[in-house]
Design a protein with these regions (language model features):
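Active-site cavity-forming subdomains of large catalytic enzyme subunits
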Residues: 44-115, 119, 123-132, 142, ...
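Hydrophobic helix-and-loop "lid/oligomerization" segment in the mid-to-C-terminal part
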Residues: 1-50, 70-71, 88-91, 97, ...
């Protein structure tokens, strides 16, 4: 949800500012997570000179280096943790050598609030950009529903700035005229006048998520961008059906994972589900964590490797612990 919403915020806003812009949504299984060399080369071959990442890129040091070697301009917008290595002098942070890196979790970043999701990073970038162009922020504020949607679904802390965004975003959804978002609300049979954070986090969000999990997130992006009601209704119905399918797969996988977890008393549970669809590993990990109150990593078979996703508890910094054994992984982030 966060990636789709941040991509949509950037796409819609940059287009409004007159940029020639398109959105590429990596296929979760074929392309993996985030930007990669194949996508960069494809963009370069098509004559594209600038790449702007959203909700990813902070861990893409080599990929950014490759884009720069081709003479491309690359801007990273992300909210994930900055990778680092431990040295005798302390932590050495590994920041991609992009033309600009916008991430409030950088050590030297003075932005006061550190719990933004990717869509809010995109929203703040566009807000600053329109201000520098001397353009009214009215159009930017119309994007608050998407920032609110991502904020709730990415489960960031609902404090300070995030609480305000969700509060005002919910109010704006009730009066939203966007065809795509309204089509999804209708497909889910939600009364717009009574919409709240539950509907965002447990009804609308999962439908957007299901697109990227079982098909391609491009379908969700197409829905949000659609201006034709008939086409939007078809896309929304398709996303709703995908989510229903995802629910059934998740229930089955969760049952298997809990059965496996019963046989182990480890402080951190690592569960291998051979036939699990890799896109729902994180959801299953979250369900097992809730049941066992332990950090959980769910692994499954992927092309040429084993792939997984983890969910932790408040007392355990999973990303920090993974960094201690990073040589065991081909790639990871958080």
């Amino acid at each position: 949800v966060d990636g789709v919403c941040s991509g949509y915020i950037l796409y819609r806003s940059l287009k409004k500012l007159g940029a020639v812009v398109d959105v590429v949504v990596p296929h979760r299984i074929e392309d993996g997570y985030g930007i990669n060399e194949n996508l960069i080369k494809k963009a370069f071959d098509q004559g594209i000179d600038t790449i702007l990442t959203c909700d990813n890129g902070i861990a893409a040091y080599n990929q950014v280096e490759y884009a720069k070697s081709l003479g491309m301009t690359i801007i990273v917008t992300d909210h994930h943790e900055v990778p680092y290595t431990e040295t005798e002098q302390g932590r050495e942070y590994i920041i991609p050598k992009a033309d600009a890196v916008i991430n409030h979790k950088q050590k030297d970043c003075g932005y006061p609030f550190k719990e933004l999701c990717g869509a809010m990073v995109a929203f703040q970038l566009i807000s600053a950009l329109t201000e520098s162009y001397g353009i009214s922020k009215r159009d930017v504020y119309r994007l608050l529903p998407y920032a609110a949607l991502a904020t709730v679904c990415d489960v960031v802390e609902l404090q300070g700035e995030n609480r305000m965004v969700v509060q005002y975003g919910l109010k704006m959804i009730k009066n939203c005229k966007d065809v795509g978002l309204n089509a999804l609300i209708d497909a889910c049979k939600i009364d717009k006048n009574n919409i709240d954070s539950y509907h965002i986090g447990f009804v609308l969000g999962p439908c957007i998520n299901a697109s990227g999990r079982l098909d391609t997130a491009k379908k969700a992006m197409e829905l949000l961008s659609e201006t034709n009601k008939e086409k939007a209704d078809i896309l929304a119905t398709s996303l709703k059906e995908l989510n229903d399918e995802r629910k059934a797969m998740t229930e089955e996988g969760t049952k298997k994972a809990i059965e496996i977890a019963k046989d182990y008393d480890d402080n951190v549970l690592v569960i291998y589900l051979k036939d699990c669809h890799e896109s729902i590993a994180g959801i299953i990990a979250g369900r097992v964590r809730e049941r066992c109150n332990k950090p959980v990593i769910v692994l499954t078979d992927a092309k040429d490797c084993v792939k997984g996703s983890g969910r932790s508890i408040e007392e355990y910094d999973m990303y920090e612990e993974l960094c201690k054994v990073k040589d065991l992984f081909l790639k990871f982030g958080g």
